[in-house]
């Protein structure tokens, strides 16, 4: 689970609830540049206050046994990408955080929207690579601008891991490439149809417990990418709650996926 905030006590209490709810890791968001988040004085703006971030990490680690990580940028605004980023990582890692997921862009807190902040600031992968050289005992995971699973291979020569976001969400089927490309395991023979059929019991369980079925199925829409009936499939998933027999409709959709 990812938490956002700047109050060490409240974050510690939130971590307790998260652990009790079954989450296996706490990630602290120090990367979001949205105006709302800035006004709450958390997210990316906290990169300017590494001491407070360190206090938050200490509080969380004192309250839970599950791992704690930080997601951040390489800097914000006029921060020095070399000196200031190193100082931030040093301060926060000394408080007990050993895993950092680093979006290889600065965040500009004024003048750019959150969407623009995901694309306009230039990527600086080399800076993230150097972080791993500076802090070899930390786990450094690179993020930002990664469009294909194949992109991961070159980064993994320099860092410990890769995080992909929007591109995997929009086309989740490409995750089947991870095992053969990264781990040298046999390629999965699962089709998109197989995957959706496997998800039907979960969807119906959520539906029976009162969840809005269309919100659950919203996250399957990426399976339609590149298929012949993509528009039809996405429309059916969005309207699944209007069908009398949603389970039967899901089977029909799965058959359209092929």
Predicted regions and their residues:
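Flavin-dependent oxidoreductase catalytic cores
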Residues: 2-258
């Amino acid at each position: 689970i990812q938490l956002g905030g700047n109050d060490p006590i409240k974050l510690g209490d939130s971590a307790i609830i998260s652990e009790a709810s079954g989450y296996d890791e706490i990630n602290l968001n120090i990367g979001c540049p949205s105006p709302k988040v800035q006004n709450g004085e958390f997210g990316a703006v906290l990169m300017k206050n590494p001491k407070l971030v360190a206090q938050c990490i200490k509080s969380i680690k004192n309250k839970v046994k599950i791992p704690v990580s930080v997601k951040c940028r390489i800097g914000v605004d006029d921060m020095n990408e070399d000196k200031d980023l190193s100082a931030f990582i040093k301060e926060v890692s000394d408080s007990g955080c050993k895993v950092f997921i680093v979006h290889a862009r600065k965040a500009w807190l004024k003048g750019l929207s959150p969407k623009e902040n995901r694309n306009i600031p230039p990527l600086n992968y080399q800076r993230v690579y150097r972080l791993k050289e500076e802090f070899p005992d930390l786990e450094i995971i690179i993020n930002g601008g990664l469009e294909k699973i194949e992109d991961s291979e070159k980064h993994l020569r320099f860092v410990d891991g890769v995080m992909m976001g929007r591109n995997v969400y929009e086309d989740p089927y490409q995750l089947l490439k991870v095992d053969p490309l990264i781990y040298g395991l046999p390629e999965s023979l699962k089709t998109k149809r197989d995957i959706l059929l496997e998800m039907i019991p979960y969807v119906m369980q959520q539906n029976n417990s009162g969840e809005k079925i269309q919100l659950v199925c919203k996250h399957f829409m990426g399976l339609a990418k590149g298929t012949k009936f993509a528009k039809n499939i996405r429309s059916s998933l969005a309207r699944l709650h209007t069908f009398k027999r949603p389970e039967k409709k899901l089977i029909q959709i799965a058959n359209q996926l092929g």
